[in-house]
């Protein structure tokens, strides 16, 4: 890894209100891919604007994927990152689905940890705050034509953040969405592609106008079974069971989802992955079993 470090002369002072994704650290990690050469030129360098060609393939054909994870400081001032290996593996899963090159997991983890260590002074210390890590990859070919790009760029971007929603860690209101479909099986639903989020914007905007924070998506065929919320998976606690929709090819396999299932099982709780109809949820609510 090549290092170009920006020497900071003043102390970092974070604002009292961080928001989400509005503030960025001093450095980024970049690495390029070209056909025939593979991944090369890994560099940690000062944050700067990306240069793009008007014909860059990602602008026209949407070949873009990303991840989102967090780094924290413990009470002993140690830096911990939440399951970064699983996130990089999921990035590779998304890459395969839309014909993008995979990255070496061990090397990507090394680069990620190095970047976080260099900008560790940006990690907030307050409860509920963290350093958000956004790995993303996109096609960079300066050419028109519907095909996989020959060239790509991988970037790691860091941002000190508070809670994602304005409500903080309080419960949020979600609107059951049956006018639009987020994804269908054998589509892109199980991948973290930019296209999935673009497709969700109109529904989220309409929900916001009605006073809701997010959308609860139903399956794309029958519009009957729970799938996920706009930015997260969902669990439903019934009287004697905690259930979450099973992964069917249209649901993002969340890292937090996977962790919650593992913890609940270790606690000896009855957790299941299965089809959950919205009618079942409403019925359980009416009977006082939700």
Which positions does each model-derived feature cover?
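Charged, gly/pro-rich active-site loop segments
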Residues: 105-107, 115-128
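Helix-start/capping segments and mature chain N-termini
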Residues: 1-115, 136, 143-290
């Amino acid at each position: 890894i090549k290092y170009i470090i920006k020497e900071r002369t003043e102390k970092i002072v974070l604002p009292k209100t961080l928001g989400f994704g509005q503030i960025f650290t001093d450095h980024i990690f970049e690495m390029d891919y070209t056909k025939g050469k593979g991944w090369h030129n890994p560099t940690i360098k000062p944050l700067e604007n990306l240069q793009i060609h008007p014909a860059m393939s990602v602008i026209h054909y949407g070949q873009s994927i990303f991840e989102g994870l967090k780094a924290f400081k413990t009470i002993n001032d140690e830096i911990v990152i939440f399951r970064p290996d699983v996130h990089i593996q999921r990035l590779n899963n998304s890459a395969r689905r839309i014909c993008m090159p995979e990255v070496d997991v061990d090397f990507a983890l090394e680069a990620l940890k190095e970047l976080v260590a260099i900008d560790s002074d940006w990690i907030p210390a307050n409860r509920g705050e963290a350093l958000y890590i956004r790995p993303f990859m996109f096609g960079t070919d300066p050419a028109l034509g519907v095909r996989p790009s020959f060239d790509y760029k991988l970037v790691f971007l860091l941002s000190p953040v508070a809670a994602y929603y304005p409500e903080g860690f309080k419960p949020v209101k979600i609107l059951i969405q049956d006018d639009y479909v987020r994804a269908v099986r054998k589509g892109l639903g199980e991948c973290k592609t930019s296209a999935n989020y673009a497709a969700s914007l109109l529904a989220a905007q309409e929900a916001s106008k009605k006073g809701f924070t997010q959308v609860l998506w139903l399956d794309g065929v029958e519009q009957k079974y729970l799938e996920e919320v706009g930015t997260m998976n969902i669990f439903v606690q019934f009287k004697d069971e905690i259930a979450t929709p099973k992964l069917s090819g249209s649901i993002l396999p969340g890292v937090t989802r996977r962790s919650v299932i593992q913890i609940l099982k270790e606690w000896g709780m009855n957790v299941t992955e299965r089809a959950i109809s919205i009618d079942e949820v409403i019925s359980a609510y009416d009977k006082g079993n939700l």
